[in-house]
Amino acid sequence: MKDLLNLFNQQRQTLDFDAIKIALASPDLIRSWSFGEVKKPETINYRTFKPERDGLFCAAIFGPVKDYECLCGKYKRMKHRGVVCEKCGTEVTLAKVRRERMGHIDLASPVAHIWFLKSLPSRIGLMLDMTLRDIERVLYFEAYVVTEPGLTALERRQLLTEEQYLQARQEHGDDFDAAMGAEAVYELLRTIDLQSEMTRLREEIAATGSETKLKRLTKRIKLIEAFLESGNRPEWMVMTVLPVLPPDLRPLVPLDGGRFATSDLNDLYRRVINRNNRLRRLLELSAPDIIVRNEKRMLQESVDALLDNGRRGRAITGTNKRPLKSLADMIKGKQGRFRQNLLGKRVDYSGRSVIVVGPYLRLHQCGLPKKMALELFKPFVFAKLQRRGLATTIKAAKKLVEREEAEVWDILEEVIREHPVMLNRAPTLHRLGIQAFEPVLIEGKAIQLHPLVCTAFNADFDGDQMAVHVPLSLEAQLEARALMMSTNNILSPANGEPIIVPSQDVVLGLYYMTRSLENKKGEGMAFANIAEVKRAYDNRVVELHARVKVRITEVVTDEDGNKQNKTSIVDTTIGRALLAEILPEGLPFALANTELTKKNISRLINSSYRQLGLKDTVVFADKLMYTGFAYATRAGVSIGIDDMLIPDEKKGILTEAEAEVLEIQEQYQSGLVTAGERYNKVVDIWSRTNERIAKAMMDTIGTEKVVNAKGETIDQKSMNSLYIMADSGARGSQAQIRQLAGMRGLMARPDGSIIETPIKANFREGLNVQEYFNSTHGARKGLADTALKTANSGYLTRRLVDVAQDVVITEVDCGTTEGLIMTPIVEGGDVVEPLKDRVLGRVVAEDVFLPGNDEDPIVTRNTLLDEAWVAKLEDAGVQTIKVRSTISCESAFGVCSRCYGRDLARGHLVNIGEAVGVIAAQSIGEPGTQLTMRTFHIGGAASRAAAVDNITVKTTGSVKFSNLKSVEHANGSLVAVSRSGEISVLDAHGRERERYKLPYGATITSKDGDAIKAGQTVANWDPHNHPIVSEVAGFIRFIDFVDGITVIEKTDELTGLASREITDPKRRGTQAKDLRPIVRIVDAKGNDLSIPGTDLPAQYLLPPRSIVNLQDGAAVGVGDVVAKIPQEASKTRDITGGLPRVADLFEARKPKDPAVLAERSGIISFGKDTKGKQRLIIKDTDGSEHEELIPKYRQVIVFEGEHVTKGETIVDGEPSPQDILRLLGVEPLAAYLVKEIQDVYRLQGVKINDKHIEVITRQMLRKVEITDQGSSKFLNGEQVERQRVIEENARLAARNELPAHFDPVLLGITKASLATESFISAASFQETTRVLTEAAVRGTSDNLRGLKENVIVGRLIPAGTGLAYHSNRRRGASGLTESEMQTLAGTPAAVEAPVVEAEAEQASED
């Protein structure tokens, strides 16, 4: 028995480790693993099924086939344990050792390891400084390589063909050594002196000036450094001994009929052994060189195939033409070891079945079929049957259960009571896809699911299936109950809003119940209390929708937090009064005294959660559901064809539109508009028409005429079934109703362009053949899109999870003072997202002061902003707040609670150990399937609003300019001469209410600080022309204006005025190639004037197609227009939307034609153009210049003499995130990414909290590039984890040495995942071969910090409850006793007490 215990303890010893290291295996190491050499290719004797001696399954090498029994049967049973049979050589032990004992093959000739040879960049190639092509020629015996030049003129590593070799041999005899094949490469690698090579390279780096050379040298230095540090030897990349996998990992299974199913590896090994043995024999016979060479090459190829089949040449195929699965294929890809077995496992104690609705369940319950429950809880039932004495042995218990005796069901009830089970619906896109419930036993075979959790699971009852899992250990049950119970997951982790919200028929019922209608039975009655209302309704004295007065008593909390009763008489309806019955105490009736649409119900549950807490809300949600179902049944809403009312105006509107289209067609035929304009205008007309019809239809369906109590006929909201469904938010939308009863409208072709003939009919009228055909186009594409979308969205989620998986909350406060400055998001004058929504649940980074009061802050640093605080700030009129953000968090690993802020799913500051990275990834990835897949072609109305030509304010207040550079015109108005200028309207409190961009050349009619009224116009401009404005007064002088060459004179037929148009330089011919038409402004004497504040001459280079209306010598004043450039109706450019856009942003891809940003602040001027480019110069204040060459086809939007600030756009386009980071820094980049990604989601109506996007951005920015290495060990241009540089710099600072300087680098999520410190995590993500090769050469250690690595090695993850376990484990390593360790780990020794202890410790740490 003692031996047995020793055996168990022995196995336990290996379990505890802190890191995993990967390195190259030396031949000695491989031999030390091995239990013997495999000499024969035989596998098993197909008659006796016994393994052959010395073969691939040999029992002497790998261990016995049966437990404690040798092959020949001489020794059997436990008592001979450890004996080696002298007859068959087998050790008597467990057969399980055949899974762990390895063998080896001694290769007759060295073989290069294909991974280090072919996986790019080739490590052997870098080490030898030879090209892969050359090494392959040597390895595959096409050329000789000089290994030792001796005193000859040959170079080491020089290649010689057969002829050159023979010639050299004749010349020099034996003075030099040259060889071919892997031996030569082995020799070259063995003789490298790493240390001196290193020194030589460092000197070369210092001396070289060429970029490409530097790159190559840096790569080599890194590789050699890696070898030196890891203790690997270069020659180990060429193998002399090949390890053989344990046989049970490459099984050979006899099938019936004398055939065998075998693992491909056996074929590959057999090939290697055959060739190796043949080569050995040939060498012993000293066969001719050419034969030996061929055999060596074949050996090399067979080892290549074994390690990584198909990487070089054609893959070796098996009997059925399918490539054999090599060792590398075993670990990579979705079916490989990592993703199939280590990251995803099949679990015991689980079952699955179809789900049906369980409308009588409480929120924390689910219905579990009895049969299923009995099977799942079998061991528990057995144990209890034994304990009760109903069965003496497990066997007897089993019989009882199989017979399904009556007492079994009673015991099952007891076992199941308060034992939660977990339900999961695939695909699990976010953490709410698995939740815990208490099972309720039901008859039947389907699982019953509570309707309110359907949103979270994204489940419906059209045949969906769900899986059930049983948490077995006490800790698991505890976590399931405390963390995963459906009642603890009321709020969505993505946006902090309730996710347990009624939908569909519940909403319909509640909406029907709370509608109010004119002149219903009982209108105007007054009731003393709700009970009286109920009696009146039950006795049919009143109708549900009648407007009545009711005396209602509510519980309100006063300032001091005391509860008081408040009674008031409320105007309400019968239905709403009945609803008041189920309102929890403390929730004001006013919230329910409205029409309960889905939005209002969500608001109701939200307020309940914030004001009353979890328990009351859960009860309330259940009651709402029951009530909703009851009244939906009473309402009996159904729709018929007559509910789809077609508006009478439809005919007239269509006739008008057709007339307009005809008119444009005529204009086109008489040549007044181009084909493109005609198409755009037609599409515009039809879009507008569609909107008008839709509006008319909604008015028709949504209102009805009724007679009120006074006998007057009035309009009221109708009770049309179709309308109430859409209005309540239960089902259907205005767009869908429009197609049913309005007109179907314009259809898109599969490529996204719009068919200009709309479908004028709706579904009620029916479509004709042509209309039907037109509509199939888009419909079919929709289906194809959906299929693609799901895959794309899943892949995005996977990349996001991978990049952020190791972001965990590790400490309470990192102490940083940095943060992001938050302002409301304003677009085109509308506040899209107010400040309160953006800062809710964030921690303040700096004290917030009111304007004009710098003494006492309104909010102090480190305050968590909850609903009350946010309201306070809103009232005080605060416009900008600096909040903490994960992007600026300074925690070494993970992030701190304060930088993250509120845990959205719980509503309080986030706990230590919360895996915020994974939550962020899920929150962004989960709605991915709702995003569109398409690229929008912006043409026609699809999205182009009418040209805006002025700014009219919507609110009364005062004007504020920001970033505005303007000049004052002679008539007193201001003219904007900058591009980044903005104008905002402030209310009485100084809060910004609206903000607008001011284009260059806009005329501004009010001054900074002026008071204005709503509806007043503050600025206007010409939308069709881009002006060039003079900033000085003087006289015009034309330069390089040559009629017919650089300018063409035109006379307007109507006005008779002459104007000049600048021609396109491409059409000017050679004599004019140096002419640059410029308008210069001079004083009365003809001297050049300069632009105010600079020494640049006041001159304006005119781009092609600009028009000059002034004559040479004409006088101009400040702010006058010198020339104007006509703007073509905005070019239709493709806008990538939806999922591809989100993916592009997260992958930090550079846009196709990126915007050019100013590299520094200064004054713009233009230099001499080259052939296809224009030269733009920015001259800064100290006179230094920066040049930018810009292709001619790109539109430069700045003019000569204009002042730009660093990072401002000078050429239109989509800015590249890398440029934003480089020129403006991390915070503007974060703001840009957040804004762009949110825009995509907002368009689909998906709410995601900013902080999730920030967490991912933090991970994209975790690398930095060394710009100056200082005294550090880093190399210039190297990319390093930011944390490593900071630690190194701290060390250097302590020794008074030079720190390394660095710039932040933005990596896309795929790149960032592969660049992570943990090689296990990277290898299990993508490019497994490359990652492992790199890691092995470096001798990398994986410290198992992230979640993924720990899942793979099978430990608790360092997040949540696992974080406490790991910190205790580390503490144990530093001096706790074994028993204390067991206690903390919560081993079954004493289950209940230690859990509490560990929890208490966790709490004290917090």
UniProtKB/Swiss-Prot annotation:
EC number in record: 2.7.7.6
Residues reported in the UniProt entry to bind Zn(2+) 2: C814, C889, C896, C899
Cross-referenced SUPFAM superfamilies: beta and beta-prime subunits of DNA dependent RNA-polymerase
Top-level taxon of the source organism: Bacteria
SMART domains: RPOLA_N
Reactions that this protein is recorded to catalyse: RNA(n) + a ribonucleoside 5'-triphosphate = RNA(n+1) + diphosphate
Binding site for Zn(2+) 1: C70, C72, C85, C88
Subunit composition and interactions: The RNAP catalytic core consists of 2 alpha, 1 beta, 1 beta' and 1 omega subunit. When a sigma factor is associated with the core the holoenzyme is formed, which can initiate transcription.
Protein name (database record): DNA-directed RNA polymerase subunit beta'
Source species taxonomy: Bacteria, Pseudomonadati, Pseudomonadota, Gammaproteobacteria, Lysobacterales
